[in-house]
Curated annotation (Swiss-Prot):
One of its GO terms (biological process) is translation. One of the primary rRNA binding proteins, it binds directly to 16S rRNA where it nucleates assembly of the head domain of the 30S subunit. Is located at the subunit interface close to the decoding center, probably blocks exit of the E-site tRNA. One of its GO terms (molecular function) is rRNA binding. This is Small ribosomal subunit protein uS7. It comes from the Bacteria. It comes from Bifidobacterium longum subsp. infantis (strain ATCC 15697 / DSM 20088 / JCM 1222 / NCTC 11817 / S12). Keywords: Ribonucleoprotein, Ribosomal protein, RNA-binding, rRNA-binding, tRNA-binding. InterPro entries: Ribosomal_uS7 (IPR000235), Ribosomal_uS7_bac/org-type (IPR005717), Ribosomal_uS7_CS (IPR020606), Ribosomal_uS7_dom (IPR023798), Ribosomal_uS7_dom_sf (IPR036823).
């Protein structure tokens, strides 16, 4: 363990077009092989598609989508006397944001549309409407936590 204390949190600067840290975090999640300009093109064109389809502010739609994906509970493994229990714990806000962005990008990549921008735009739209694979992932996570409620007294 480190003797220097907890590590400092990385501060994400807002993106240049929308001035939003959420969009900047999404760009960083889409990023592959250090090609940030390509990731920016993908995210900005996806947000343009969202604006065309909904005629609403794309950042507001993105935030609504992330709110629908964000988990409040998750299960963590805890070993007690030779048995491993899935213990439900509350998700801290920072981790909840990270998980929602991760699920959004992962399930966007798994979609079948032609370009990544289309996949991301459609996943954002589905999530903002409470549909899509990323929202289903949150529901599954909550179901797991609910099913293992009996082990809640093992939480740390």
């Amino acid at each position: 363990m480190s003797r220097k204390g907890p590590s400092k949190k990385h501060v994400v600067l807002p993106d240049p077009i929308y001035g939003s840290t959420v969009v900047a975090q999404l760009i960083n999640k889409i990023l592959l092989d250090g090609k940030k300009s390509i990731a920016e093109d993908i995210v900005y064109s996806a947000l343009d598609m969202v604006k065309e389809k909904t005629e609403q502010e794309p950042v507001a739609v993105l935030k609504r989508a992330l709110d629908n994906i964000r988990p409040s509970l998750e299960v963590r493994s805890r070993r007690v006397g030779g048995a491993t229990y899935q213990v439900p714990v509350e998700v801290k806000p920072n981790r909840a944001n990270t998980l929602s962005l991760r699920w959004l990008t992962d399930f966007s990549r798994a979609r079948r549309e032609k370009t990544m921008a289309e996949r991301l735009a459609n996943e954002i739209l589905d999530a903002s409407n409470g549909l899509g694979a990323s929202v289903k992932r949150r529901e599954d996570t909550h179901k797991m936590a609910e099913a293992n409620k009996a082990f809640a007294h093992y939480r740390w």
